[in-house]
Amino acid sequence: MGAAESLIETFRARSDAADRTNEIDPDNYRDMQRIGITAAFVPKELGGFGLQSIHDWTLTIATLARGDGSAAIAISMHLSATRGLAALYHRSEPGSAPHTRAKQVLEAVARREMLICSTTTERGTDNLHPLTEATACEEGWRLNGTKNFVTMSPLATHVATNVRMRNEEGDYIANVLMPMDTEGVVQLGDWDALGMRASGSQSVQFDNCLIPQDALRTIGPWGGWSIPVLVNRTLANVPLVGAFLGIAETAMALAVEGRKRLRIRLRGRVWPMPSL
C-alpha cells in the first residue's frame, strides 16, 4: 500500500490527458513495475512482495484509484492472474510441470518482462459457458472466439482467459495463458466508453491461434461451477470494489474542497446546498 500511495499524485497528473484521448498511459504501468506493484503476489523467493492478503490487495487498488481509476482497475486484472499463478506454484509438487510453468511466469513478472491482461467476458453468454473454443489438432490446440472488456490489453505481453475445451470425457472450462503476439490474436480497438476510458478495455479476437498441447489447464465442467472457477471469480471481483472506493473517496474530497471555496450568497447568507 505504501508503494501505491507514492503514485497517487503522479497518476492524477496524467489522468486527464489519458481520459481525453481515450488511451491507456504506459508510464503508469512502468511505474508500477518499477516499484514492485505488478509483482505483489510473486513469492519473495522469486523476487516479489509475497502478498497473500486480499484485504491489502483491495486497499492497494483503492489507493491507486485515488490517482487514476482506470489504471487501478487494469492492474487489478494482472494481479488476479498472478495471484492464481502464485497459488498454483505453492500447491504444486516442486519439479512438476504446473509448478515449473508457474515459477517461470512469476519470475518473468518479477523481472518486469510480463504484464498479463485477464478476461472471461463474451457477448451472448456468461462466465460458465464460454463460447471461445480450443479445438484439438496435431500441433496442440486451435483457439477461436472473441473476448470483450480485455482490460489493459494494449500494453499486455500476455492474455489469460477461460475457454471451452472438449475431449473424450466431455466439455470443460479451461484456462490458457498465451503471448499477445501469438499469430491470430487481433486487438479490435473498440473501447470508447464514458468511463474508465484509459483502461484499454477493448475486445480481442482469437483467429485460429495455435497454442501448445500443455497450455490448457482444465478448471471445471463447461456450464457448471467448480471450486477453481468460484475462487477465481470471487477473488477477481472483490478487489474491484477497492477501485470504486478510491474513486468515491476522491470525488468526495474534491466536492468538499470545492464547497469550501464556493461562496454563493443571497441576502447576506450562504445559499443552502445540502447535497454538499
Model regions and ranges:
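Alpha-helical interface subdomain recognition
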Residues: 1-45, 49-59, 241-276
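Short loop segments at secondary-structure junctions
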Residues: 89-90, 137-138, 164-168, 180-183, ...
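A short core secondary-structure module
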Residues: 146-187
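A generic structural signal for well-ordered coil/turn residues at beta-strand boundaries
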Residues: 114, 128-130, 155-157, 172, ...
